[in-house]
């Protein structure tokens, strides 16, 4: 079976590698996002999928847009039996849906129709979902609304962050993808239940709002790891791990038994466990607080 693979992020890699390793599939081309400046030197950096595909000698295309002139003709030359799309990052024009014999098959890291959109895993953690999963679906012209070939469920660990969950679901999805492709001609996909739709828009606010309840902040820290931060004496401090509890009385920024207890909304407190101050390495909270020994604790904001 001739496959065109579309993917860009680390999440895409297990599926790509599974397809390349399987004897039944011939990955004839890879589509991935164009290299972009990254790092301190702003050097042009290729996506993980781009690097992996080049190492395997597979042709790579990285158009800025699939709507550009000539893209449809180029795809036709590859004559794929199926197009597999996993965390690609570009909008698919309508012509891609009919560019292969079996259409476009997608790995989506949620139990559709719950959490359609760009950040399904983040929203699952943030909302306190205890289970999530992976959906293998047929792409149609609407966002994450295609018919479902296969779903599998998994629990979300109590302390699992987005990186851990993403790694697990990417491996889970790669196994499910092969299972679907091996029998795609005999599987009858199921339509999604539109009454159960929830939307997972991209989350882009990373400063901790201490007006929120501390348990919500803890979920946000896990969902957006390692980006959530507070300000301390003009410096950003990322919170990488934290706990929460309810309290009777305390002051904002109390230090109790070498722990920082931060008052939050709803009579709750946040206790950072692992933090990273700007330009410094991550450390446990006791090591962090040693920097202020003999000094008054700056205001947390």
Swiss-Prot record:
Catalytic activity line of the entry: L-methionyl-tRNA(fMet) + (6R)-10-formyltetrahydrofolate = N-formyl-L-methionyl-tRNA(fMet) + (6S)-5,6,7,8-tetrahydrofolate + H(+)
The keyword Protein biosynthesis belongs to this UniProt entry's keyword annotation: yes
Listed GO MF terms: methionyl-tRNA formyltransferase activity
Protein biosynthesis is among the record's keywords: yes
Gene3D superfamilies referenced in this protein's UniProt entry, alphabetically: 3.40.50.12230
InterPro entries assigned: Fmt, Formyl_trans_C, Formyl_transf_N, Formyl_transf_N_sf, Formyl_transferase-like_C_sf, Met-tRNA-FMT_C, Met-tRNA-FMT_N
Keywords noted in UniProt: Protein biosynthesis, Transferase
Residues annotated as binding (6S)-5,6,7,8-tetrahydrofolate: 110-113
Transmembrane segments: none
Enzyme Commission number(s) from the entry: 2.1.2.9
Enzyme class: transferase
Similarity comment: family membership: Belongs to the Fmt family.
PANTHER family in the cross-refs: METHIONYL-TRNA FORMYLTRANSFERASE, METHIONYL-TRNA FORMYLTRANSFERASE, MITOCHONDRIAL
Protein role: Attaches a formyl group to the free amino group of methionyl-tRNA(fMet). The formyl group appears to play a dual role in the initiator identity of N-formylmethionyl-tRNA by promoting its recognition by IF2 and preventing the misappropriation of this tRNA by the elongation apparatus.
Name of the protein: Methionyl-tRNA formyltransferase
């Amino acid at each position: 079976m001739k496959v065109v693979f579309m993917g860009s992020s680390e999440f895409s890699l297990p599926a790509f590698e599974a397809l390349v390793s399987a004897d039944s599939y011939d990955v004839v081309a890879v589509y991935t996002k164009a290299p972009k400046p990254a790092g301190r030197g702003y050097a042009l950096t290729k996506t993980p999928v781009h690097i992996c595909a080049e190492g395997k000698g597979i042709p790579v295309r990285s158009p800025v847009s699939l709507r550009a002139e000539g893209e449809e003709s180029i795809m036709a030359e590859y004559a794929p039996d199926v197009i597999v799309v996993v965390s690609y990052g570009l909008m698919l024009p309508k012509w891609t849906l009919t560019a292969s014999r079996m259409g476009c098959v997608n790995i989506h890291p949620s139990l559709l129709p719950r959490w359609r959109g760009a950040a399904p895993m983040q929203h699952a953690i943030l909302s306190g979902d205890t289970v999530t999963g992976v959906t293998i679906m047929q792409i149609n012209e609407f966002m994450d609304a295609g018919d479902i070939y296969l779903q599998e469920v998994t629990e979300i660990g109590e302390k699992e962050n987005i990186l851990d969950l993403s790694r697990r679901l990417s491996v889970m999805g790669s196994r499910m993808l092969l299972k679907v492709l091996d029998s795609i001609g005999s599987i009858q996909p199921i339509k999604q239940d539109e009454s159960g739709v929830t939307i997972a828009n991209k989350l882009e606010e990373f400063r901790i709002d201490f007006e929120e309840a501390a348990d919500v902040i803890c979920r946000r820290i896990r969902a957006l790891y390692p980006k959530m931060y507070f300000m301390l004496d003009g410096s950003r401090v990322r919170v990488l791990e934290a706990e929460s509890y309810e309290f009777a009385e305390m002051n904002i920024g109390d230090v109790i038994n070498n722990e920082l207890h931060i008052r939050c909304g709803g009579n709750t407190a946040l206790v950072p466990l692992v933090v990273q101050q700007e330009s410094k390495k991550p450390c446990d909270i006791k090591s962090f607080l040693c920097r202020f020994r003999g000094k008054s604790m700056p205001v947390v904001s």
